Amino acid sequence: MMERITARKNPLLQQVRKLVSSRKERENSGLFVADGTKLLTEAVKWWPGLETVLLSDGVEADVPEHVRVVTVPKDVMESISPMQTPQGALFLCRLPE
């Protein structure tokens, strides 16, 4: 089941912003952020630590049922993505041990 987030101050979106901007936050939480539909496809195939996927409106992805999937408006995706031109798929993964 997909969730929908529209508020920029949502705790998940605030966490994503911190992970993007702070190495210390990534180390403390054990998570990292990646961006891109092709990279997401590879993460689904090969990365067991895939936890949460954020998708822009209109972007679809085939992810396992145990992975949290959240849709957001395009402007919200642009506000949290580390990329200048986001591809519409942002995801959180566990750092390797």
Protein language model features and the residues they cover:
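Arg/Lys-rich RNA-binding interfaces used to dock onto structured RNA substrates
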Residues: 1-97
